[in-house]
Amino acid sequence: MGRERIALERDGEGNFSKTVSGIAPGFHYHFWYVDGVQVANPVAPVAYGCFGATNFFEVPGEGEDFWFLKDVPHGDVQIRTYVSGVNGHVKKCYVYTPPSYDREPGRKYPVLYVQHGVGEDETGWIWNGKLNFILDNLIAEGKAREMIVVMCCGYAFLKDEDPVFFPGDFGREIAENVIPFIEDHYRTAKGRSNRAMAGLSLGSAQATQFVARFQELFAHLGVFSGMRDQEAQQILSRHEEYPMETVLMTAGAGEKGLDQAQKAYTDRFRALGVAGGQRCYPGYHEWHVWRASLRDFAELIFRGGAQAQTGSGTGEADFTYQEAPLDTEQMDRQTFAEHILMFDPIYKGLVHAFDENGRPAGKYKDEHCGAEVVDAAEGKFRFWIRAKGAKTVEADIWGMGCFALEPAEEDWWTCEVRGIEKGFHYYGVKVNGVDVLDGNAPVGYGGFRAINYLEMPEEDFEEYRIRQNPHGTVHLNYYRSEETGRTKLCYVYTPASYEKEPDRRYPVLYLQHGGGENEAGWIWQGKLANLADNLIAAGRMEEMIVVMGTGYAFPDSGAYHPAMSAFTEELVSSGIPFIDRTYRTIPDKEHRAMAGLSMGGMQTQRCVFAHPELFRWAGIFSGGLTIRDEEADYSAILLDPEEFSRRFAMLFVACGTQEWSYESTKENEEAVLAAGVPIVTFEGYGYHDWTFWRHCAKDFLPRLFR
């Protein structure tokens, strides 16, 4: 099956569908079409590909489960922050640490640096490549050494630069910033024998270039779906000085001639005693080929015995990580542009070309950002959407209405909107009246779908912005729900001191999203990590662990609350025990808090009132305050100062003055306060949205654990 379009058929309820056979196993990017207009579907899975949010689906191959989530010990996936000395940008990298990393504090680990392809980014190897599951499974089966794996965003564009093929000098960023950062923050084994470089497509060319340029740093090279003759020849020519230990080159069977071009070099490496060779897999230039490539490469590398664990006797000097002072304007731009699919978005397209030797020599063409601030003081925003052949295009800003875009140059549509209030705004895009997703604008999860959003800067709100303070770590952890039998994902923030003070224990806040959103909301829409970093750096907040879980739990038995699911039961039976096992918590109620917004606020009240043995601190943001209703009666606590004080150190209740629930929340707050119960209340101009909830967090976090 090639690039032909598949016509869907309308059912009787306004939906379109089609059952298709003959699709090859693997990961498949795809596009949707509305009246012939190419769009992205907001209710289908989305990843970052082709320089934007792009839909995908998976067809599992029979008997191929090496990349599946399995019941084995899971490593930790961490989102780390560093600064590029090449272009002065704040960058994020994803770092995988193996299951033993926290259990064996005296052990050092080899490091694999692995790069994405053109049009993709630092999220690709986790969400598309399933790298963490592949490593978990290989390690559990004893097929690979335990290792740290680092996944970076391989773009290092300078302003007004016009690079050919390689997107800026990312090699210098790897050598001068990334490796020093990793060596400074992780227990790494020293020496080139304990360091590998690999990549796919563009990333394979970068990997080959980096190893040729910095042969003193790497002894292992993985080239997936690529070939660089000049650099491969250079590595061979210096083999006596810098002997390679592993060189694996791979290709899909459909990448005609690539396997033989690779084999011409791998045969020469093998003649020198270098492990690896060339491998070819069913498929084309696509993720299921690269997953298999990673699996095979991970099995080969770091087989040097004890040295790979101790890192001793290399004679390599220590790396020093230092950050240059950052530009505030640049940090602000990145604050308002960051989103779950890409931390430091670039708006580019690739114009494919080849040089006289047949090597890729494409250039990068600037694209419009889907939503950009024109004048923050006037609340003026400009929307840009590419929609070739569309009849109508609209931007639907939640709470404001729809705004028609007009045709502009080169298939773009645009409009300028004034009067947008400060803060965070979800917006939808409609093409010919159909809801779609703009791949060139920030993407979040809201309304039970992928959705675009924009940021109108709040000039007097400094705490939610990226600043050059010590940065905490965001972890992606998997645990099993006893309520549903499913594996759940939670995001966990640990403060900057967590790795530096291994004997220290921390209080914990469980912080929940609202209905229609998920575990990623507080990090990307709520800017929780930025808030915590800045408040801690200013001495205004106690250092704490913050856990953000998926607030949905639907057991097959049907035993769950119709509005809040069985999440509160799951948190008690599974979530808290997992966090206390995994992190250095202070596991008592005096050092445990729960808070949430909207549905998460309702879940918070339900959970903390039912479990006084677990929590002393609570926060309800836009979730109302129930004294009594048809389901529960909390009056014996909320109207009795002595009983309240026995249970709570603090109950924080917040509601925006523009919210539909403001009057009822205010009435119940006043009744509780009139009874002499010292709840903390917070209100201000605000709607039921992330703008207000960020301010709730800013006020709530400094009050905890004091």
What are these regions (language model features)?
Residues M1-C402, P407-R706:
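Non-catalytic cap/lid and distal C-terminal segments of serine-dependent acyl enzymes
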